[in-house]
Amino acid sequence: MDRCKHVGRLRLAQDHSILNPQKWCCLQCATTESAWACLKCSHVACGRYIEDHALKHFEETGHPLAMEVRDLYVFCYLCKDYVLNDNPEGDLKLLRSSLLAVRGQKQDLLARRGRTLRSTAAGEDVVPPQRTPQGQPQMLTALWYRRQRLLAKTLRLWFQKSSRGRAQLEQRRQEEALERKKEAARQRRREVKRRLLEELASAPPRKSARLLLHAPGPVAVRPATLATSRRLSAAALNPRRQPAVAPGVTGLRNLGNTCYMNSILQVLSHLQKFRECFLNLDPSTSEHLFPQATNGKAQLSGRPASSSAAELSVRSVRAQGCEPQGLCWSSGASISRSLELIQNKEPSSKHISLCHELHTLFRVMWSGKWALVSPFAMLHSVWSLIPAFRGYDQQDAQEFLCELLHKVQQELESEGSTRRILIPFSQRKLTKQVLKVVNTIFHGQLLSQVTCISCNYKSNTIEPFWDLSLEFPERYHCIEKGFVPLNQTECLLTEMLAKFTETEALEGRIYACDQCNSKRRKSNPKPLVLSEARKQLMIYRLPQVLRLHLKRFRWSGRNHREKIGVHVIFDQVLTMEPYCCRDMLSSLDKETFAYDLSAVVMHHGKGFGSGHYTAYCYNTEGGFWVHCNDSKLDVCSVEEVCKTQAYILFYTRRTVQGSAKLSEPHLQAQVHSSSKDERRTYTLP
């Protein structure tokens, strides 16, 4: 509710019990879940999804306003809605600030190597309802913080109305205007410098080609110490095999809540067909497809050269106590020197291209030379082309995957249509091949069959899909006091697929059957004959890579989602035969329906608004599974993968020669095509 009149009468006491974390429990049942504090008195009770003691307190006392102590929501029982406004004194805002100050004393437990995981309200913030002397300092801290905010607010208003305050405000405005002018001047200087560099790079070389064939002169180096010279001489006398990184075992540094992007990029790079099509795109020869900076610094050679030092900086990190031999399995932990490649914080070309960034990143990750990459250029390209993911907020990995593939598809289609004359024939052919892989690798088709109950007439519609969003059975959505029976702590993936393809009855008479209305003329003013019907979804064409998105959320209360933390049992081999239409089963070999597990994206945490994403990927080059946790990579077994709490599953079809598509004669009748959504509709008598 935007305006609640009961908030204007709110008067908070400075020693309210909500400021003491030890009292964040129900006074009747002592539970700490969904605790609501009355804003009229010091009473604390549980919500309606626990024992409903807060509502009973309102019925007994008539106090309408209550605040949830962790989510900081305010609810009015008289208005029967959540409150969004505040009283003129701003007490609710100050109260929320005080509670955040109390909770901020325990946030150090969540800091892990420069990355803070924002846990849910039911995380480490829960304090047992014990009366110990430790709660008194926290209450005093909250009271002091609230009084300081009130005093600062009063002094700020008084100072702004004084003559000195107005003069200071005017001076600040002048400084901001001067800073804007300086920034504009700096921007103009950068633009002039960029144009000058472009002109110098495009100018013809002054030296002849004969001079370029000579070997470069000696490079000046710093004088080495005695210990360094001894190590170099020992290495020259006893040459050893240089330490190598296994191809694909390259970590991606977390640049600030970018675990969702890192996990998806690791999965896409481990899908062999998707990876190979982007590796075949060479930016140095495909100039029109990937417009480069004219200074030539965007090219990535086999080893870092001096010309690319402005774009990529190589940092040598020495691991202590490790042997200088063997492959790097977990971001350089088993070798004496691991190389970290740090991309430039701006895209490497004037024209931002996700295809170019994917090519560069995949080439580095599968070169076997880098143990860790900081994907700054990829992140800024995503920010520029997908504004919804701009910033360092927590994001959903499934939404990012869909948006990334959509933008890559749009980019390839626009390059092939708008600049067709300028692109050579070989590059146009290469672009079409990549676009075909992007469009078809996840593309499948569903058969939507609606059966009229009155005349048993069946209408079939073919719809495209790129992933299957599977819902949990109904028993996991029914919450009774937050308790889940022990026999429902696990769910089968096959059960979720069966629920997706089961027959459901449409509510009421809402279906206009073509057979029942066939004798009715179009000019007839009488309404259409509506009847009851059944609907079923079946797989009509299987994709090369099957994406299964597990919808791990349920609604608990009003406008509140929570995660379903049930373990889903999935196998390494998945057979899709039971979920396809019957005509497909008779026309194809059984091996066509077999899928092998390729990757798993896992979400750690109790809610989708916070947590952490990691990925389990199968390395096709080495034949092993690897757990990709940002910059840390560990080899694991398939048994460990199957025990994870999966969020997105990727299965690759074993045989791709046969087309898992139903032939046209099996569905005879009328065919309707739609250019808008590319759907085909078949009707059967």
UniProtKB/Swiss-Prot annotation:
It comes from Mus musculus (Mouse). A zinc finger (UBP-type) spans 2-99. Zn(2+) 1 binds at residues 4, 6, 76, 79. The gene is Usp49. Its main location: nucleus. Zn(2+) 2 binds at residues 26, 29, 46, 53. This is Ubiquitin carboxyl-terminal hydrolase 49. The keyword Protease applies. Keywords: Chromatin regulator, Cytoplasm, Hydrolase, Metal-binding, mRNA processing, mRNA splicing, Nucleus, Protease, Thiol protease, Ubl conjugation pathway, Zinc, Zinc-finger. Disruption phenotype: Usp49-deletion mice exhibit increased resistance to lethal HHV-1 infection. Component of a complex with RUVBL1 and PSMC5. Interacts with centrins CETN1, CETN2 and CETN3. Belongs to the peptidase C19 family. Gene3D superfamilies: Cysteine proteinases, Zinc/RING finger domain, C3HC4 (zinc finger).
